[in-house]
Curated annotation (Swiss-Prot):
Name of the protein this chain belongs to: DNA/RNA-binding protein Alba 1
Localization per Swiss-Prot or TrEMBL: Cytoplasm; Chromosome
Family: Belongs to the histone-like Alba family.
Biological processes annotated in GO: chromosome condensation
SUPFAM superfamilies per record: AlbA-like
GO terms for cellular component: chromosome; cytoplasm
Pfam families: Alba
Gene source species: Aeropyrum pernix (strain ATCC 700893 / DSM 11879 / JCM 9820 / NBRC 100138 / K1)
Main subcellular localisation: cytoplasm
Amino acid sequence: MSIEPQKPNTILVGRKPTINYVMAALKLLNEEGAPEVVIKARGRNICNAVDTVEMLKNLFIKNLVIKKVNIYSESLDSEGKKKVSAIEIVVAKG
């Protein structure tokens, strides 16, 4: 498992309520002027990441553009035997 530093415009979606991640993305896009936001999740939290983007798009930012979706697997152990699915969704204002 490789640990890489996260960019400041990255949101890691976990078990908190979805609205928390929506508000974090809104803050990055509106107040901090980030050109794009990367929403990442692994395993069971992938559905929360998708819900976050859908809430942003349908309720808050009508011209939200989904620039890129990357689906991949990450190794959980050094041998690479255990893997977990992951998703990265890059969004920006249109």
